[in-house]
From Swiss-Prot:
Its EC number is 3.2.2.-. Keywords: DNA damage, DNA repair, Hydrolase. The keyword Ribonucleoprotein does not apply. CDD domains: AAG. Pfam families: Pur_DNA_glyco (PF02245). This is Putative 3-methyladenine DNA glycosylase. One of its GO terms (molecular function) is alkylbase DNA N-glycosylase activity. Belongs to the DNA glycosylase MPG family. It comes from the Bacteria. InterPro entries: Formyl_transferase-like_C_sf, MPG, MPG_sf. SUPFAM superfamilies: FMT C-terminal domain-like. It is an enzyme of class 3 (hydrolase).
């Protein structure tokens, strides 16, 4: 299945299917162990009120990055699915470029290195310049061959609207998730 076909599905399906995939930005990255799905029809999504300059990439083609700044501090990375929907990358198990990620994050703790969307962004060197870039274009590298469709699920973190939806997915038993399920 092509990347475009993989991401041309509902974000809830994609978020679950990304668990176990390998994702790298340049030489740094690891195994995706936690994701959250967002859809334009639910009020927690940045796209709920329609396209804006900030969320324009969420309405672009599937298999592209949507990068936004959270709390004015952290760059967060989403993978665009169907128009107005995407998957937030919440946590990775670091496997490559560990020293570089430790330098960027100013920590040596592997468990905390990419545990949470802001930490993922900082460790991978994510910034606004990557917004709208295709996931098949450098510096991105996404390998879906190890992805598992056996993810555990729970409610999303840090939201107040549509908080009851179990659209957070994780790799069962992983110590690298941002919060236990």
């Amino acid at each position: 299945m092509s990347l475009t076909a993989f991401f041309s599905r509902p974000s809830v399906v994609v978020a679950k299917d990304l668990i176990g995939a390998n994702f790298f930005v340049g030489s740094a990255g690891g195994i995706i162990v936690e994701t959250e799905a967002y859809d334009r029809e639910e009020p927690a999504s940045h796209s709920f009120r329609g396209p804006t300059a900030r969320n324009r990439s969420m309405f672009g083609p599937p298999a592209h990055a949507y990068v936004y700044r959270s709390y004015g501090i952290h760059w967060c990375l989403n993978f665009v699915c169907l128009p107005g929907s995407g998957v937030l990358i919440r946590a990775l198990e670091p496997t490559a470029g560990i020293e570089l990620m430790q330098e960027r994050r100013r920590t040596i703790s592997l468990k905390q290195l990419c545990s949470g969307p802001g930490r993922v962004g900082e460790a991978l060197g994510i910034d606004r310049s990557l917004d709208g870039r295709g996931l098949d274009q450098p510096p991105f590298r996404l390998d879906l061959s190890n992805a598992k469709a056996c993810a555990i699920s729970g409610t999303r973190i840090g939201i107040t609207r549509a908080a009851e939806l179990e659209w957070r997915f994780g790799l069962e038993g992983s110590i690298y998730v941002s919060r236990k399920f």
